[in-house]
């Protein structure tokens, strides 16, 4: 999730350092309680650390039994951060997931390639944020939003992202980068083009996560780079629906935030016709685990 809203008591307990980026203030300089970017990540980790490792595993087991198995899902991509930060917890987690009734494909969503290699993992990221989301109006766009000022935020410079992606190519690590808006996806494409020019011939099925607003040129470049696009079909149902009341909880977020650009959100047909592999998922728990709804 790209934003958190906390009250004054929560701010006091979490103790978010004021030096972190993303603490929203009003026109008088008073903290509003809305946290984004670094402050949001700090708050989420602080809250998760209130639970023991065993409590977290118990919640995972319950979620699988109650929400995932009833939907017929047999494989889950798990994108983890705080749960496996300590190497001892990572080893315990590997043993834990072997006992679960579903297959778990584990991603560690950090930017430290040395740590990934030390753990002998073959992939990293999955939710390394290049930008935010349309819901929070911080997905990075080339043109301004329709309903608010600004065109979103990029969380890396191009040089920083180039360096990270190149490190993955050189270490034969698959990387998944979260890029919702067209400006963010442009950064991802440029980083892969930079890395492939230096390390040609690598084919690790690198992932572009979400890819909700692309241009036709970007689709063609993604194909040339052999990127897999990890997308969420149900987003179009819940966020791009213009028939109010068709599904519970649906809205017109794409229309409201993007205007006419909503006509090129989630271009599944064009992406498939270009020969790109789409990995369709739910982005749970943002949307329910329900493959048939996505189909």
Regions found by a protein language model. Give the residues of each.
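Divalent metal-coordination and catalytic microenvironments
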Residues: 7, 72, 132, 178, ...
